[in-house]
Amino acid sequence: MSLPLTRKDLMIVNMGPQHPSMHGVLRLIVTLDGEDVIDCEPILGYLHRGMEKIAENRTIIQYLPYVTRWDYLATMFTEAITVNAPEFLENIQIPQRASYIRVIMLELSRIASHLLWLGPFMADLGAQTPFFYIFRERELIYDLFEAATGMRMMHNYFRIGGVAADLPYGWIDKCLDFCDYFLRGISEYQQLIKQNPIFLERVEGVGFISGEEAVNWGLSGPMLRASGIQWDLRKVDLYESYNQFDWKVQWQKEGDSLARYLVRISEMRESIKIIQQAIEKIPGGPYENLEVRRFKKAKNSEWNDFEYKFLGKKPSPNFELSKQELYVRVEAPKGELGIYLVGDDSLFPWRWKIRPPGFINLQILPQLVKKMKLADIMTILGSIDIIMGEVDR
């Protein structure tokens, strides 16, 4: 009896950059043997906008509106790292009230980011119902952002030395109401998702990363903590006022896609706990340190008529960055978001290097999808949680 011939020819498939499950303009060149993945090559750069070079030709205040376009689902964190870099470089003190407001906004933004990860992730796996529930809760967070900052997404709220405006009257009560409501919502998500056998079949044991691999690849955030590494910059670096609150680092030891899901769900609960404590302990006082505003020195104090027409009477609140260098980081929803800043005794940074967590975490994707099925690519890529605006910069 003749045996059937085995297929030796491989198929090369382009996934993206327009595929809806690519979470942006990501392109994957996938080599397949039937349904089995032999190789996967991510192609990046479709959303590159030169964010680092733009920063080196702007003052920090002028650059703030740009940074919300990195990770446009967690804009508070990109603003926070942008103002933290010059604050640490020049040793600028932050009023206690401003620090508490920052913590509240950062944790609300973390919840919103995790929600917008969870909805499309479940949709990629074939579950449409959680997608609509999650957008309902996310709109409540955006209502809080709009009331405090005037914008629902691109907030432009953080300032060097504090925040742009104080919390409006009645905002704290609305935030507490949301916290109570959302805690019940998380329990609903768990009942709806965690007990679903189809969901468990798709994520359990898929995309395994050991703790040693996670460290060697430089992973951070839920990708690192889901592999058994208890590393959270809010505990390690003690920035803002996180050391004044009682909360725990959420982690899992399994290292698969299910563990990454559980870490993010648990982080949303911890964020609610931090917000409630911050609202309870929030002090009075100023919301911005106005003394940090060092106005640009005019080289020639006697302006002629032509220059006066084009220069406003009140210059923008710029200040010089001294000739130093430092690296500053925050714990963003997707991992460690860092800035390497080099000052040069001028208003513009000499070097502004962005360390995006999504770009680093994405590098392990080819290793995770090899020897897996084609359908598992969506599960693994979704569990990494990337935003291409941040990856390409």
UniProtKB/Swiss-Prot annotation:
GO molecular function, one term: oxidoreductase activity, acting on NAD(P)H, quinone or similar compound as acceptor
One annotated Gene Ontology cellular component of this protein: chloroplast thylakoid membrane
Record-listed E.C. numbers: 7.1.1.-
Membrane topology summary: Peripheral membrane protein
Gene3D superfamilies hit by this protein: Cytochrome-c3 Hydrogenase, chain B
InterPro entries membership: NADH_Q_OxRdtase_suD (IPR001135), NADH_UbQ_OxRdtase_49kDa_CS (IPR014029), NDH1_su_D/H (IPR022885), NiFe-Hase_large (IPR029014)
DNA damage keyword on record: no
Catalytic activity: a plastoquinone + NADH + (n+1) H(+)(in) = a plastoquinol + NAD(+) + n H(+)(out); a plastoquinone + NADPH + (n+1) H(+)(in) = a plastoquinol + NADP(+) + n H(+)(out)
GO biological process: photosynthesis, light reaction
Keyword Ribonucleoprotein: no
UniProt keywords, alphabetically: Chloroplast, Membrane, NAD, NADP, Plastid, Plastoquinone, Quinone, Thylakoid, Translocase, Transport
Enzyme class: translocase
Major localisation: plastid
Subcellular location: Plastid, Chloroplast thylakoid membrane
Function summary: NDH shuttles electrons from NAD(P)H:plastoquinone, via FMN and iron-sulfur (Fe-S) centers, to quinones in the photosynthetic chain and possibly in a chloroplast respiratory chain. The immediate electron acceptor for the enzyme in this species is believed to be plastoquinone. Couples the redox reaction to proton translocation, and thus conserves the redox energy in a proton gradient.
Similarity field: Belongs to the complex I 49 kDa subunit family.
Subunit structure, interactors included: NDH is composed of at least 16 different subunits, 5 of which are encoded in the nucleus.
Protein name: NAD(P)H-quinone oxidoreductase subunit H, chloroplastic
Species, as recorded: Festuca arundinacea
